[in-house]
């Protein structure tokens, strides 16, 4: 019996070891996944996962793991279109997605002072962010994304501190239908009701809120 049990135990230990390696979220982030097509996240999002604003790569650090996991799934399925992320997500296993999403949530993220609907709203971007435009069925951004757009759980990601280029690109993707991974097309309806100038203004508002509060 020993001659049977020991080999089986060895195989089991090897499998567990392989799974542990595959589930090393930090390694996936900095070096890439088991599939060579799953390139290291840090290449575009930075070693600290704070993103690269000039290139339009968003901050990932501190974002809820459930949200990040869903985005990876959506890139893989095509519900969220991006020529860089789609092949990377397709090359990641479910286990690798879980691991890297958990790693991202644990990474340090900037803090932002709570800015809500009671604050003064000066300018187009601030008015949309804090008051909305209900006559056009545009709710204020902070109603869902939280004070200062800090993000709320797995459903509403942080807006504060993301680059204006990234935020504007996402709003335009919803307007154009290339991003369609929100429940009941909520963001699609909102984005399509906004003008080009409003998209730019609200994107710059949240980008600047982040810079002001983090001292950048």
Curated annotation (Swiss-Prot):
Q: Which keywords annotate this record? A: Heme, Iron, Metal-binding, Repeat, Signal
The record ties this protein, via Pfam families, to: Cytochrom_C
Would you say which domain of life the source belongs to?
Bacteria
Signal sequence span is 1-22
Residues where heme c 1 binds? 41, 44-45
Which residues does the record give as heme c 2 binding sites?
141, 144-145
Under PROSITE patterns, the record lists:
CYTC
Please list the residue ranges annotated as the Cytochrome c domain. Answer: 23-108, 118-210
What this protein is reported to do is described as:
Acts as an electron acceptor for the thiosulfate dehydrogenase TsdA.
Q: Mind telling me what this protein is named? A: Thiosulfate dehydrogenase electron acceptor
Query: What organism does the record attribute this protein to?
Result: Stutzerimonas stutzeri (strain A1501) (Pseudomonas stutzeri)
Q: What is the lineage of its organism?
A: Bacteria, Pseudomonadati, Pseudomonadota, Gammaproteobacteria, Pseudomonadales
> What gene codes for this chain?
tsdB
């Amino acid at each position: 019996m020993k001659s049977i049990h020991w080999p089986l135990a060895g195989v089991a230990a090897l499998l567990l070891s392989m799974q542990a390696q595959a589930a090393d979220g930090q390694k996936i982030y900095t070096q890439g996944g088991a599939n060579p097509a799953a390139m290291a996240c840090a290449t575009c999002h930075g070693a600290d996962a704070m993103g690269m604003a000039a290139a339009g790569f968003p901050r990932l650090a501190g974002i809820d793991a459930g949200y990040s996991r869903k985005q990876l799934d959506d890139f893989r399925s095509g519900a969220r279109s991006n020529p860089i992320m789609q092949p990377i997500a397709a090359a990641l296993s479910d286990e690798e997605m879980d691991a890297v999403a958990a790693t991202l949530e644990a990474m340090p993220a900037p803090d932002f002072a709570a800015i809500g609907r009671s604050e003064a709203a000066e300018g187009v971007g601030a008015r949309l962010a804090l008051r909305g435009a209900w006559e056009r069925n545009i709710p204020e951004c902070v109603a869902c994304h939280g004070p200062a757009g800090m993000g709320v759980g797995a459903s509403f990601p942080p807006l504060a501190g993301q680059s204006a280029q990234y935020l504007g690109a996402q709003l335009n993707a919803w307007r154009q239908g290339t991003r369609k991974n929100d429940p009941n097309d909520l963001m699609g309806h909102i984005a399509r009701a906004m003008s080009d100038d409003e998209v730019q203004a609200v994107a710059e508002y949240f980008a600047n809120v982040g810079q002001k509060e983090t001292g950048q």
